[in-house]
């Protein structure tokens, strides 16, 4: 009788041990499945992010003058780039992309001196009048001039225009930049809220003298 009780007790212990073992296996399998699901989700998110990044890089900016980029003039930092012609709205305000050779862009931001006018360093400076002149270095004659429009693109605001220029060669780009005061922009001058700087009264001139231009097949 005593032996039967011992045998029964051993049987119960064995059954309990097997049940615990099966339970542990189930937990491990579920955890592994969850981890696999998380890894798959992470991979998918990473892939989507990569695709999105590739889609946003749909154009290549070309420096007008590599040796004279990001020039400091007065309170401004000025650079010039170009890329494929683009369509803009409202229509009719500039040359159609189909009729242009490229889109010429002036990136103009406030530098440290520009903070005296109330801009943050690196901020886009709006309401400037930006006149451009493209000069053939071989003849010193203008081959195109006008006034840039201000506009927004996916990478931020800038000044620009679609330009027609078919002839390869060495050119000089000259920008003449008039202050926002011309368009009625005002500055606070009181002791409590005023700025310490003053708008420039004569146009600021920026020159990109070494533009080695080659027409592109966009």
Outline where the language-model segments fall.
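Sec-dependent N-terminal signal peptides of Gram-positive bacterial secreted proteins and lipoproteins
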Residues: 2-28
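Bacterial lipoprotein signal-peptidase II cleavage site
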Residues: 21-52
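Short amphipathic, basic-aromatic surface patches that mediate peripheral association
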Residues: 87-89, 104-123
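Short coil-to-beta strand junction motifs in C2/discoidin
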Residues: 100, 119-130
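Solvent-exposed serine/threonine-rich low-complexity stretches and specific carbohydrate-binding patches
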Residues: 144-152
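Aromatic sugar-binding surface patches on proteins
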Residues: 153-160
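Short acidic/polar inter-strand loop motif in beta-rich domains
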Residues: 178-188
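Short beta-strand elements
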Residues: 186-218
